[in-house]
Regions:
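Active-site loop-to-helix "anion-binding N-cap" substructures in soluble metabolic enzymes
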Residues: 1-391
């Protein structure tokens, strides 16, 4: 995979695929981490004398332009960070193809407003990529959070132009290689989030490689159910209970320390104001749902992680957006901020959680921008966006 250092960008028009998929509250960006993560590549290209056309997505819009998914707040924030105008183009026809234009940075509106970007039809994606390719001499791939998607701007477009990896993708791949090729031990993985179905593949793969596996978030209740406990109104993937039983058995066979909660925080409804109660996993009431791991479990998780030399964390331990159900996530974040080993925080929710709770990025070894992309890499899957950059 070639990098920015392998190319002279002077006078070139560059198509830069970024991951600028930031969380929004109305038009307010609540975490600009992904924008800041793109700056090293953008600044390198500008310093080298390139003119940049940025392609990026935001969320999953369904039917063309939707104001709530517009990149306008992103363009505005990027402009402030660069102290340069960033021109936002609504349509391809609004983009300038002139490398001598006074505008050094232009951004196409949310690439997912164009249905061809995510089309299942390869020919449709290729035709769209050909239209995009007219605006650049070279493609720079830097949207690590999207490299697991077979989308036109990620897979087809880089195959039509000379291509290189940006600073972010290069750094992400280097970090993930540390986790997969020869991690310092003990090696722990902490997985949270809502659905077991999103993580079952990576759990099955990692259980063969790790020393400690800690499970939290909504998906933990499928594990608790698999152990034979009642889980009340908690989230559960019923069709995966047998798979989860197999994972628990496999962990025992391999002597992997599988951390599951002994207590949880429950509430009658999914609400910020709902009264929170700590209960044992043996006594989850039928009319309550689990929304966080309990304080005893949080302490046990933190203790188990303290001596680890390599840790990968993806997904919060509970509904961290609600203060009453944020303590499990906070305890894990605190423990990981204090370990002397190498820690990778992966996934938008985990990164947003630590920033919301007042932690600094510098307190952790590496904050990854890739949620699903990181997980699929660790699962051993081939990622279309990386394949394209290696072609």
């Amino acid at each position: 995979m070639r990098t920015l250092d392998d190319v002279d960008f002077s006078g070139k028009s560059v198509i830069l695929r970024c991951d600028l998929n930031v969380p929004l509250d109305g038009n307010l960006i609540t975490d600009d981490g992904r924008i800041k993560a793109s700056l090293p590549t953008i600044k390198h290209l500008l310093d080298a004398g390139a003119r940049i056309t940025i392609l990026a997505h935001l969320g999953r819009p369904k039917n063309g332009f939707q104001n709530s998914f517009s990149l306008a707040p992103v363009a505005s924030r990027l402009s402030a960070l660069l102290d340069l105008p960033v021109v936002l183009a609504k349509e391809l026809s609004d983009l300038s193809g002139n490398s001598n234009s006074a505008n050094k940075v232009q951004m196409l509106e949310n690439i997912r407003f164009f249905p061809q970007e995510t089309s299942k039809d390869e020919d449709e994606r290729l035709d769209f990529a050909k239209d995009l390719a007219k605006f650049g001499d070279i493609y720079v791939g830097d949207g690590f959070g999207a490299v697991h998607r077979k989308h036109a701007s990620v897979y087809e477009l880089p195959r039509l132009l000379p291509n290189v990896a940006g600073r972010l993708i290069s750094a992400e791949v280097e970090v993930l290689k540390k986790l997969t090729e020869n991690p310092a031990r003990p090696y722990a993985v902490v997985l949270g989030g809502a659905k077991v179905s999103d993580k079952i593949g990576v759990i099955a793969n990692l259980i063969e490689k790790v020393d400690v596996l800690a499970i939290g978030g909504g998906m933990v209740f499928t594990f608790i159910s698999a152990l034979g406990h009642e889980i009340g109104k908690s989230m559960v993937d019923v069709e995966l209970i047998e798979n989860v039983k197999g994972l628990i058995k496999r962990a025992e066979e391999l002597n992997v320390k599988l951390l599951l909660p002994t207590d949880v925080v429950v509430a009658p409804t999914f609400s910020k104001e709902a009264p929170a109660t700590v209960v044992s996993i043996n006594n989850i009431p039928a009319n309550q749902m689990g929304l966080d791991i309990g304080p005893d479990s949080a302490k046990a998780y933190a203790l188990a992680l303290q001596g680890c030399e390599t840790v990968f964390w993806n997904g919060p331990m509970g509904v961290f957006e609600f203060p009453a159900f944020a303590n499990g996530t906070r305890a894990v974040a605190q423990a990981l901020s204090e370990i002397s080993g190498f820690c990778v925080v992966g996934g938008g929710d985990s990164a947003a959680a630590i920033r919301t709770m007042g932690f600094d990025d510098e307190q952790f070894g590496y904050i990854s921008t890739g949620g699903g992309a990181s997980l699929e890499y660790l699962e051993g899957k081939l990622l279309p966006g990386l394949i394209a950059l290696e072609s």
